[in-house]
Swiss-Prot record:
Organism (species): Chaetomium thermophilum (strain DSM 1495 / CBS 144.50 / IMI 039719)
Family: Belongs to the DASH complex SPC19 family.
Subunit structure of this chain's protein: Component of the DASH complex consisting of ASK1, DAD1, DAD2, DAD3, DAD4, DAM1, DUO1, HSK3, SPC19 and SPC34, with a stoichiometry of one copy of each subunit per complex. Multiple DASH complexes oligomerize to form a ring that encircles spindle microtubules and organizes the rod-like NDC80 complexes of the outer kinetochore. DASH complex oligomerization strengthens microtubule attachments. On cytoplasmic microtubules, DASH complexes appear to form patches instead of rings.
GO cellular component, one term: spindle microtubule
Function: Component of the DASH complex that connects microtubules with kinetochores and couples microtubule depolymerisation to chromosome movement; it is involved in retrieving kinetochores to the spindle poles before their re-orientation on the spindle in early mitosis and allows microtubule depolymerization to pull chromosomes apart and resist detachment during anaphase.
Keyword vocabulary terms for this entry: Centromere, Chromosome, Cytoplasm, Cytoskeleton, Kinetochore, Nucleus
Protein name as annotated: DASH complex subunit SPC19
Length: 173
């Protein structure tokens, strides 16, 4: 009986090794065919395309291209015009920012104008103090003067912008 015992042990060990090898093979096969349903669907779709003649496909592509081509061109033109408009807007905003920066640098900390108009005429603020109504009128005149200067500067900026745009158009033409 002792002689049969080692042979049974060898048999059980061999059976366990075979079982492990079989489980490994099943796992490998499982991984190999896991994508099989999707692969079948893809291949079935390819077969459908193979059933349609090449001339029919070419005609359908040409028809589709003719149908949507003008719309694509229209969208591209719109996008190009929008980009040009945005570029002009950016240039205008840059010019306005430069103008505002120049204005800010012209004014001192107390709010009086040190700009191009300050040397003209007399400065009535230093001559004599004004009463209530005259002070109010002087303030209104100063505000109107500032508004007019701002308008002149803005118009000058617009003229410079138009000149730049005209130069760009002439260079492109």
């Amino acid at each position: 009986m002792s002689r049969q015992s080692p042979s049974y042990a060898d048999c059980v060990c061999s059976l366990r090794t075979s079982l492990a090898f079989l489980e490994s093979s099943v796992a490998t096969l499982d991984n190999g065919v896991q994508d099989f349903p999707r692969l079948c669907h893809v291949l079935r779709t390819v077969r459908h395309y193979e059933l349609i003649p090449q001339t029919t496909l070419a005609a359908a592509e040409a028809s589709l291209r003719d149908e949507i081509g003008p719309f694509i061109q229209l969208l591209l033109d719109r996008a190009e015009k929008h980009l040009d408009r945005q570029a002009r807007r950016i240039e205008t905003l840059k010019a306005r920012a430069e103008l505002n920066a120049g204005r800010l640098s012209q004014y001192s900390g107390d709010g009086h104008n040190n700009g191009k108009f300050s040397g003209q005429g007399m400065d009535f603020r230093k001559s004599r103090p004004l009463n209530g109504e005259a002070a109010l009128r002087a303030k209104v005149v100063r505000q109107r003067k500032e508004a007019l200067k701002y308008s002149v500067e803005r118009l000058e900026m617009e003229v410079r912008q138009k000149e730049r745009e005209l130069k760009l158009r002439l260079e492109q033409a």
